[in-house]
């Protein structure tokens, strides 16, 4: 009986694991490099790991023809393998004619996305590759909520959209990971080539190279469920007894928005209720997304338009006395707004409109402090927005207005449009003007404010008419290879649009538009274009390195902190808001009144513990010289959360006209590469182990003490005699 017990214990203790558990390479995957769960009010989207999609044999899809192997589950190449696959796939093969195969495949665990290295130029029309919908932000469209249109009536992105609702609104059954590290990609490719690549006759055999990856989301369902779980009374039941903390399962998408006031109006107890002014808001969105949200540079979707606005702001900042004098006389002002989250149902502008309605924009007001005077929706005359600059077909631009509101204030609006046209024509660009009362505004920040006020007018300047010309709006592939001619034309467009912004703004506030006021700095435009667009990272150029001055630190192992990304995210782990904030301070900040301030500590004290809180003081270097100075500016950087999903919003003020996008908190693991052996190999190893154990027991059982060599002195020592 004892012998059989020994046998059982020995066999149970033997590790009979095959090669499938022998990981030979681990690749670190940072936050933002993989697909995860996102939510709106009614649905969940994105990816979730489960037992069916974690492991798989690595295969390649290098060209269109390779998708036929996906349809057959690669049976002709791996006839003895019955598991699932991880497919290496270049991003440019995500197309209209391939997306359905990826969605419906039953043999994929996931896809490993990477940039193919093929050059894509801004005017390339060969591939529809927008990851956004045919009707971007259709659910938040002013005309839909005003019951003037049906859902997605104007398919403005029909040329570029891969799917009707966009790739971010797909609930995938597979996982996705994006590999941007060339060394990691080479390791995966080498593993495939050594073990999985079929021979010339098409055959292959064990062992194979396998891959495992897991991203586990903490939340599921929709944003309504997520919102309820985020409330304090719900967190009480989730609290960790040891730490006292309630785990966050999901949260609203939010990040910094930037508002700059060249000529701010102060508040005070005596004038807070009587001052009224009119405003032109000049705006550009600062966010984009891809099918893996963070992988989104947004060159044309975001960056070129922002450069146009920054150049106009810089020109205004160098002549600020003239603008201040004109604003004081006309009681009209211009301010700049960079909204974040606009590609996801207008998160930033929706929150700003809500705050305006409640008297909290741009700052919370305290009676014992002087702030920038609150702006109300009815004080906005115009929202001048620019989009998709740098990719015009020929030299033609379009201005988009709301037809009904245009007819109500045609004379003044025509004057603004006329100044825009003059600015464009000074650089040999043409402008197509509004056609009539039936005009509708394309997706733009104006939609948020149109719901809050019946008179605010859109003046949207863009290089498209009824449909987007650029076919990669909000896409991983919104990253171009610019030839010298394409780069020069884009810079010319940015210069022309920036001049048009200045011309319209100057006429609105009553500034005499002489050559000095209307001139923009083309050299600065060229420099920022090369830094933000052609450089690999925001701080790779000399201009941005000097502007940084050692202030930027990569605090997180996230894609947005280590690569160029314009996605809004939930935790603000992206560098771009910081980059844009510093550039805006450079454009509008001044050290004329702070020349005697010689340290960062002294500079920061200027804005602290004072009753006058209208200005901020920033210790920042000059991007041309690298020398630090204390810059005074009326620039507000604030995190904006959609009122519909903000846990701080009172229940009675909740309004579903705002964005409901949220994200799940997730746990991301590394990619593991391992060797896969045939199941028969596993059984063979178990059999060998069992036989070895039995032979060992049989051999040991036949032994006695005389079988072993014993030191003759041991018995004497046991008897107490010395050795």
Curated annotation (Swiss-Prot):
Subcellular location: Membrane
Keyword Glycoprotein: yes
Keyword flag Membrane: yes
UniProt keyword list: Glycoprotein, Membrane, Notch signaling pathway, Signal, Transmembrane, Transmembrane helix
Pfam family, one: Nicastrin
Transmembrane region(s): 679-699
Membrane protein topology class: Single-pass type I membrane protein
Record-linked InterPro entries: Ncstrn_small (IPR041084), Nicastrin (IPR008710)
Record-linked SUPFAM superfamilies: Zn-dependent exopeptidases
Glycosites: 40, 181, 271, 328, 409, 627
Annotated signal peptide: 1-16
GO biological process: cell fate commitment involved in pattern specification; egg-laying behavior; embryonic morphogenesis; nematode pharynx development; Notch receptor processing; Notch signaling pathway; protein processing
Residues in the Extracellular compartment per record: 17-678
Domain of life: Eukaryota
An annotated GO cellular component: plasma membrane
PANTHER family: NICASTRIN (PTHR21092:SF0)
Family according to the record: Belongs to the nicastrin family.
Biological role stated in the UniProt entry: Essential subunit of the gamma-secretase complex, an endoprotease complex that catalyzes the intramembrane cleavage of integral membrane proteins such as Notch (glp-1 or lin-12). It may represents a stabilizing cofactor required for the assembly of the gamma-secretase complex.
Subunit-structure text: Component of the gamma-secretase complex, a complex probably composed of the presenilin homodimer (sel-12, hop-1 or spe-4), nicastrin (aph-2), aph-1 and pen-2.
Name assigned to this protein: Nicastrin
Organism listed in the record: Caenorhabditis elegans
Lineage: Eukaryota, Metazoa, Ecdysozoa, Nematoda, Chromadorea
Record gene name: aph-2
């Amino acid at each position: 009986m004892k012998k059989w017990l020994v046998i059982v214990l020995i066999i149970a203790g033997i590790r009979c694991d095959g090669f499938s558990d022998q990981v030979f390479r681990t690749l670190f995957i940072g936050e933002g490099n993989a697909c995860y769960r996102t939510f709106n009010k009614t649905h969940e989207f994105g990816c979730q790991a489960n037992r069916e999609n974690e492991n798989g044999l690595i295969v390649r899809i290098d060209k269109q023809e390779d998708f036929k192997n996906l349809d057959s589950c690669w049976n002709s190449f791996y006839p003895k393998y019955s598991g699932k696959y991880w497919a290496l796939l270049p991003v440019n093969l995500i197309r209209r004619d391939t997306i359905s195969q990826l969605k419906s495949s039953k043999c994929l665990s996931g896809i490993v996305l990477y940039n193919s290295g093929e050059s894509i130029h801004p005017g390339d029309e060969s591939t529809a590759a927008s990851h956004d919908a045919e009707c971007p932000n259709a659910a938040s469209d002013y005309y839909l909520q005003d019951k003037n249109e049906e859902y997605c009536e104007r398919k403005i992105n029909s040329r570029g959209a891969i799917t009707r609702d966009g790739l971010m609104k797909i609930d995938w059954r597979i996982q996705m990971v994006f590999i941007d590290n060339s060394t990691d990609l080479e390791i995966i490719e080498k593993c495939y080539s050594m073990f999985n690549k079929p021979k010339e006759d098409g055959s292959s055999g064990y062992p194979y190279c396998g891959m495992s990856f897991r991203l586990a989301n903490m939340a599921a369902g929709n944003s309504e469920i997520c919102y309820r779980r985020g409330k304090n009374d719900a967190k009480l039941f989730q609290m960790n007894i040891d730490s006292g903390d309630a785990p966050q399962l999901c949260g609203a998408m939010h990040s910094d928005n930037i508002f700059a006031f060249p000529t701010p109006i102060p508040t005070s107890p005596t004038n807070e209720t009587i001052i009224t002014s009119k405003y032109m808001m000049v705006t550009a969105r600062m966010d984009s997304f891809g099918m893996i949200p963070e992988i989104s540079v947004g060159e044309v979707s975001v960056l070129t338009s922002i450069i146009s606005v920054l150049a106009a702001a810089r020109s205004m900042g160098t002549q600020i006395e003239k603008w201040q004098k004109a604003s004081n006389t006309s009681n009209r002002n211009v301010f700049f707004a960079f909204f974040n989250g606009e590609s996801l149902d207008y998160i930033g502008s929706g929150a700003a409109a809500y705050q305006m309605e409640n008297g909290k924009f741009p700052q919370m007001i305290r009676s014992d402090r002087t702030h920038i005077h609150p702006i109300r929706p009815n004080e906005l005359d115009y929202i001048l927005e620019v989009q998709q600059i740098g990719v015009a077909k020929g030299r033609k631009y379009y201005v988009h207005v709301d037809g009904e509101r245009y007819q109500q204030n045609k004379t003044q609006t025509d004057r603004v449009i006329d100044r825009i046209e003059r600015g464009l024509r000074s650089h040999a660009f043409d402008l197509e003007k509004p056609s009539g009362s039936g005009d509708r505004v394309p997706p733009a920040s104006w939609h948020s404010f149109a719901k809050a006020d019946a008179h605010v007018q859109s003046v949207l300047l863009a290089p498209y008419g009824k449909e987007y010309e650029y076919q990669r709006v909000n896409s991983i592939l919104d990253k171009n290879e610019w030839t010298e001619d394409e780069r020069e034309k884009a810079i010319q467009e940015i210069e022309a649009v920036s001049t048009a912004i200045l011309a319209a703004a100057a006429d609105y506030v009553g500034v005499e538009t002489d050559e000095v006021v209307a001139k923009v700095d083309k050299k600065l435009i060229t420099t920022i274009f090369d830094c933000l667009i052609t450089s690999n990272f925001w701080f790779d150029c000399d201009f941005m390195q000097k502007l940084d001055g050692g202030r930027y630190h990569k605090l997180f192992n996230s894609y947005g902190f280590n690569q160029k990304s314009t996605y809004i995210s939930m935790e603000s782990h992206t560098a771009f808001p910081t980059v844009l904030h510093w550039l805006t301070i450079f454009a509008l900040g001044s050290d004329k009144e702070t020349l005697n301030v010689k340290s960062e500590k002294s500079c920061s004290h200027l804005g602290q513990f004072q009753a006058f809180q209208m200005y901020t003081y920033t210790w920042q270097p000059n991007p041309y010289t690298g020398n630090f100075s204390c810059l005074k500016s009326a620039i507000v950087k604030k995190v904006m959360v959609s009122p519909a999903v903000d846990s701080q919003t009172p229940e009675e003020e909740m309004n579903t006209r705002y964005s409901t996008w949220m994200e799940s908190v997730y746990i991301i693991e590394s990619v593991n590469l391992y060797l896969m052996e045939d199941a028969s190999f596993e059984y063979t190893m178990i059999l060998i182990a069992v036989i070895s154990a039995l032979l060992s027991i049989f051999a040991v059982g036949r032994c006695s003490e005389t079988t072993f060599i014993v030191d003759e002195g041991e018995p004497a020592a046991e008897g107490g005699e010395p050795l």
